[in-house]
């Protein structure tokens, strides 16, 4: 029953269609190649451009690529043609998610080779950085992008516009100086802007994968080792994408690692002046992993040569947790806090005098990893935050290959799956075009499934993916026998006429040369020897076909014979080729007007030389004009700057003049106010005292010397009473004397009353 339901569901599937996806990385990551019934191949599409979205790559979205329509046939992109059902609801689950994400920023556009999802750049978000892939192939520039993007996030690279170019030597030198790499580490660096990786088939064996050369890049390799180290602590969630791209997930994982493990085992916080993956972070993380690795060696739980051999590392870690009863508490084998604390506690009890345990460890392959270093010593001394100290204590493994170029790196011995990325994967399986043709034949002529008999259903139990190869007589090529050819599932009366006509026409048009048809005016008779033309044969008697056209009348409209059309077309082509050969023999390859053509050709070359000379003069004049134009622009910029300075100075001058005018007005107002007050005081004095001396003093000249002498005479006169006292007080000398006398009296008062007992106290202290 379940098998019948499956076949009914397959019979109700929508017809297949061709879909074009230029994002190789997205297709490989979602694992569409795991479905054996999907056929695909690589194709080239003209008139489109592709762009990498920098922020999407950092966020590790499914799609990091957008496609834009240009209409220019010189713009070519490489993509994957996939044969899928027309209804996306019938796609596999992974392709459904990819399709939903594509519809968020693009819309389907039908092309000659299939449906392509195109993005309108005018309505695209301007906050996202678009990197134009000039070569049109994501495979060729992805390694450059990954290296340059990591250098940019490490503050060793430049602008985003250069992420797809060759890595600058200045960025490499800065990275090598910052992370203590020797110059020999970059001997296998990318040497071209676009490098085509070696391709491999999806069915290749492990041995063939191991022989593929790996492009060693220290920047990407260092990031990959950091991501593997974070996965040991169960902090890196992208386990299938440890590809060396310094993404936002790596940044968040490093921050979590510092909060949980960095503060606890190193006693410091993450340096605020460092980047995402600074030297302190690299040394702290890798040294903690190496410390745990050496301590597992001391406990005789680790047999791997390389701490970054993940399978062996997890096996040793699981053995340690099982040995001390920690595996029951952990659902996932990882370096959690409980495991690390137990590892530090147990390994501290181990002594170098334990010769028996030392012999057990020496029997393993520790010397290949440690080299000159002692693993027991390194298990307690390699934990550091200084990168120089870490590099000095590295003697082999992946870290030794990375920093010192010695020993075998990971993946050359065990972890082969990392090399099988979309860069080395060959996107080719089956023939989507042939599958689409068979599908069109099936769905274009199929009858409803209710009309099928039980016997037909039993005969069609064969899987559609298992096809038998037959030979197509019509076109002379191999094809696949699908469900549609197993039983008659179409209306013969409707399909048979057109199918027979097409087959007859193609058979006649592409028919090979044969002896009975040599003199029919269609084929070249010169290629056939004279002996073959003289063929003996039986005398043909008269047939009805010779008089058929005269006896039987054709009624219009009528369908002419497709065989006659094919023969007439071939005859016309043969006559045209013969006429062309005769014309060439008679008139030459240039035709009748060969002499005139030669003269025209000569005149054309002379004119072309003159035009080239004029073009060179125009170029020189254009260069001079551009040079003068640049000088004029520089002078204009200088004048503009001086003009701006003049404007600023004039505005400052106007401002200062306004301030000065305001202050002058304030001074004038203050003087007027003082004059009014002075006049009021004079009037009050005259009103209160009608003395003539006061009026004379007030009306005296403005000379200071005369005024002072007159005031002294008034004060010293005997007739002054209250008025003299007032002027005496107003006199500066009197005020000065009064001040001195008041100070003397106050000093005497304080000395007499307040400090009366001071000498006695001083005596007591002595």
From Swiss-Prot:
Segment forming the signal sequence: none
Keywords for this protein: Phosphoprotein
GO cellular component term of the entry, any: Sin3-type complex
Keyword Protein transport: no
Phosphoserine: residues carrying this PTM: 514
InterPro entries in UniProt: Stb2/Stb6
Keyword Cytoplasm among UniProt keywords: no
Region of interest (Disordered), residue spans: 447-469
Miscellaneous section: Present with 211 molecules/cell in log phase SD medium.
Entry-linked PANTHER family: PROTEIN STB2-RELATED (PTHR31011:SF2)
Free-text function comment from the UniProt entry: Binds to SIN3.
Similarity field: To yeast STB2.
Protein's name in the database: Protein STB6
Species per Swiss-Prot/TrEMBL record: Saccharomyces cerevisiae (strain ATCC 204508 / S288c) (Baker's yeast)
């Amino acid at each position: 029953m379940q098998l019948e339901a499956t076949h009914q569901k397959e019979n109700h599937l929508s017809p297949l269609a061709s879909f074009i996806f230029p994002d190789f990385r997205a297709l490989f990551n979602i694992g569409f190649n795991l479905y054996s019934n999907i056929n695909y191949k690589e194709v080239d599409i003209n008139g489109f451009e592709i762009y990498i979205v920098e922020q999407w790559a950092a966020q590790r979205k499914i799609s990091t690529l957008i496609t834009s329509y240009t209409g220019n046939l010189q713009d070519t992109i490489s993509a994957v043609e996939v044969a899928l059902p027309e209804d996306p609801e019938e796609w596999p689950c992974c392709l459904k998610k990819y399709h939903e994400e594509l519809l968020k920023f693009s819309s389907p556009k039908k092309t000659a080779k299939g449906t392509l999802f195109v993005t309108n750049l005018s309505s695209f978000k301007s906050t996202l950085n678009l990197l134009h892939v000039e070569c049109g192939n994501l495979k060729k520039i992805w390694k450059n992008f990954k290296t340059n993007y990591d250098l940019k996030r490490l503050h060793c690279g430049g602008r985003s516009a250069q992420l797809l170019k060759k890595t600058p030597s200045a960025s490499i030198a800065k990275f090598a100086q910052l992370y203590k790499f020797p110059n020999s580490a970059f001997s296998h660096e990318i040497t071209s802007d676009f490098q085509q990786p070696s391709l491999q088939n999806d069915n290749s064996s492990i041995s063939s994968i191991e022989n593929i050369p790996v492009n060693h890049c220290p920047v990407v390799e260092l990031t990959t080792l950091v991501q593997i180290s974070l996965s040991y602590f169960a902090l890196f969630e992208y386990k299938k994408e440890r590809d060396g791209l310094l993404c936002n997930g790596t940044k968040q994982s490093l921050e979590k690692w510092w909060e949980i493990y960095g503060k606890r085992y190193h006693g410091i916080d993450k340096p605020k002046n460092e980047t995402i993956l600074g030297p302190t972070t690299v040394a702290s993380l890798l040294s903690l992993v190496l410390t745990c690795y050496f301590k597992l060696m001391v406990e005789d739980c680790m047999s791997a040569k390389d701490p970054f051999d993940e399978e062996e590392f997890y096996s040793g870690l699981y053995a340690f947790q099982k040995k001390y009863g920690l595996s029951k508490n952990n659902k996932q084998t990882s370096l959690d806090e409980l495991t690390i604390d137990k590892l530090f506690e147990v390994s501290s009890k181990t002594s170098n005098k334990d010769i028996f345990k030392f012999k057990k460890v020496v029997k393993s392959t520790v010397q290949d990893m440690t080299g000159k270093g002692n693993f027991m010593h390194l298990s307690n001394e390699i934990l550091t935050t200084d990168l120089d100290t870490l590099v000095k204590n590295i003697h082999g493994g992946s870290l030794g290959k990375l920093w010192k170029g010695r020993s075998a790196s990971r993946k050359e011995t065990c972890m082969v799956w990392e090399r099988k990325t979309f860069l080395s994967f060959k996107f080719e399986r089956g023939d989507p075009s042939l599958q689409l043709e068979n599908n069109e034949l099936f769905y274009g002529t199929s009858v409803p499934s209710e009309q099928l008999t039980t016997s037909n259903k039993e005969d069609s139990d064969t899987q559609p993916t298992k096809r038998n190869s037959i030979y197509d007589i019509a076109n002379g090529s191999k094809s696949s026998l699908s469900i549609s050819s197993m039983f008659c599932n179409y209306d013969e009366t409707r399909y048979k006429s057109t199918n027979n006509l097409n087959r007859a026409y193609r058979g006649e048009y592409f028919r090979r040369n044969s002896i009975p048809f040599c003199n029919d005016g269609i084929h070249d008779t010169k290629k056939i020897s004279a002996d073959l033309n003289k063929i003996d044969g039986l005398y043909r008697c008269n047939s009805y076909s010779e008089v058929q056209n005269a006896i039987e009348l054709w009624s219009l409209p009528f369908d002419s014979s497709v065989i006659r059309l094919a023969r007439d077309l071939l005859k016309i082509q043969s006559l045209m080729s013969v006429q062309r050969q005769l014309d060439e023999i008679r008139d030459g390859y240039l035709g009748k007007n060969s002499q005139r053509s030669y003269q025209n050709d000569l005149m054309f070359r002379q004119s072309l030389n003159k035009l080239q000379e004029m073009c060179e003069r125009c170029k020189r004049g254009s260069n001079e004009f551009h040079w003068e134009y640049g000088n004029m622009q520089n002078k204009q910029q200088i004048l503009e700057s001086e003009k701006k300075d003049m404007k600023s100075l004039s505005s400052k001058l106007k401002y200062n003049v306004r301030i000065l005018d305001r202050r002058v007005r304030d001074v004038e107002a203050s003087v007027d106010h003082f004059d009014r007050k002075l006049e009021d005081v004079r009037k009050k004095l005259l009103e209160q005292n009608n003395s003539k001396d006061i009026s004379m003093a007030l009306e005296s000249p403005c000379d200071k010397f005369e005024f002072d002498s007159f005031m002294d005479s008034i004060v010293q006169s005997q007739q002054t009473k209250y008025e003299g006292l007032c002027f005496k007080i107003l006199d500066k000398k009197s005020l000065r004397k009064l001040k001195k006398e008041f100070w003397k009296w106050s000093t005497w008062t304080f000395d007499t009353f307040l400090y009366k007992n001071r000498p006695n106290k001083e005596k007591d202290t002595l």
